UniProtKB/Swiss-Prot annotation:
Residues recorded as bearing 2,3-didehydrobutyrine in the entry: T28, T44
Reported modifications of this chain: Contains LL-lanthionine, DL-lanthionine, and DL-beta-methyllanthionine, when coepressed in E.coli with the flavecin synthetase FlvM2.
GO cellular component annotations of the record: extracellular region
Residues found modified as 2,3-didehydroalanine (Ser): S30
The protein, known as: Lantipeptide Flvbeta.h
Location of cross-link Beta-methyllanthionine (Thr-Cys): T48-C54, T60-C63
Keyword set, alphabetical order: Secreted, Thioether bond
Biological role stated in the UniProt entry: Lanthionine-containing peptide that does probably not show antibacterial activity, since its analog [+2]Flvbeta.h does not show antibacterial activity against M.luteus. Also does not show antibiotic activity when tested with [Del2]Flvalpha.a, an analog of Flvalpha.a, which is encoded by the same operon than Flvbeta.h. The bactericidal activity of lantibiotics is based on depolarization of energized bacterial cytoplasmic membranes, initiated by the formation of aqueous transmembrane pores.
Species for this entry: Ruminococcus flavefaciens
Cross-link (Lanthionine (Ser-Cys)): S29-C33, S56-C59
Localisation per UniProt entry: Secreted
Length: 65
C-alpha cells in the first residue's frame, strides 16, 4: 500500500485500502488486472493495477488503462 501513498492527495489512503481489499486476487486467479475507481469531488479516479505474488521479485507484467 505504501507504493500508492502518493495518491492520497487525490483519494484518501483508507479508501484506496478499501478498494484493494474488495478486489483481492489470489495467486491462482486468471484475472490479470483489477480496475479500481473512486468518485471524488474533483471527478472519477480510475486505477488499473496488477496484483501479483512474486516470491523471486520477478514480476514484469504491467497493466495499462
Amino acid at each position: 500500500m505504501e507504493r500508492y501513498g502518493h495518491l492520497a492527495g487525490v483519494i484518501p489512503v483508507d479508501e484506496i485500502d478499501d478498494m484493494f481489499e474488495s478486489n483481492v486476487i489470489g495467486g491462482t486467479s486468471s484475472i490479470d488486472c483489477v480496475r479500481l475507481a473512486s468518485n471524488t469531488p474533483e471527478g472519477t479516479v480510475n486505477l488499473t493495477v496488477r496484483i501479483e505474488f512474486c516470491p523471486s521479485a520477478a514480476c514484469t507484467y504491467s497493466c495499462r488503462l
